[in-house]
Amino acid sequence: MSKLIIEPSPHIKSGVTTQKIMLSVIIALLPALFASVWIFGLRALIMTVICCTSCVIFEWACRKIMKRNNTISDLSAVVTGMLLAFNLPVTLPFYMAIIGCFVAIVIVKQFFGGIGQNFANPAITGRIVLMLSFTSYMTTWAEPFYYRNAGEIVTTSTPLVSETPASLAD
């Protein structure tokens, strides 16, 4: 019994790293980013870049101030920035998005020990704080650029409801 070794997980060693996992998540989120740029315009891309950059800067600064090793290369801050940007209205002022990034990275993620140690999802917690702080901005959503005229939008169960039986017979 003296050879029993008790260690924390993970017990299986593999070549998968945090950086590879986060890169896979970023790649998986790219179609959603392309769609948001197509639907909401270039501001969606700018919002995503600002959120990703802010999250990386806040993580770097926080790790530097706390005298911990640099972890920005694991790309988890970029994933947090993308997830937060995807959860914000495209019309939100950029400084408010940066406040959400600060809450997500510094308060929720880094103050509780970094990746894997946080008590909640950092991006969603940042959104909740923004929702509580800036309710009017967070509940106003942009009309998509894609729909140029009202005829392209169908909000009823079927477009045939607007047709009369006489016009259908013609």
Where are the predicted features?
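Charge-biased, low-complexity intrinsically disordered regions
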Residues: 64-65, 69, 83-84, 88, ...
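Transmembrane helix interruption/hinge and helix-loop junction motifs
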Residues: 38-44, 88-97
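Short, amphipathic, aromatic/basic-enriched membrane-interface segments that mark the entry/exit
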Residues: 12-22, 63-73, 91-92
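N-terminal signal-anchor module of multipass membrane proteins
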Residues: 1-56
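Long hydrophobic alpha-helical segments that form multi-pass transmembrane helix bundles
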Residues: 117, 122-170
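Hydrophobic, membrane-inserted alpha-helices
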Residues: 28-35, 55-59, 77-85, 101-108
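Cytoplasmic-side transmembrane-helix entry/capping segments in multi-pass membrane proteins
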Residues: 70-80, 97-102, 117-128
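C-terminal ends of transmembrane helices
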Residues: 57-68, 105-116
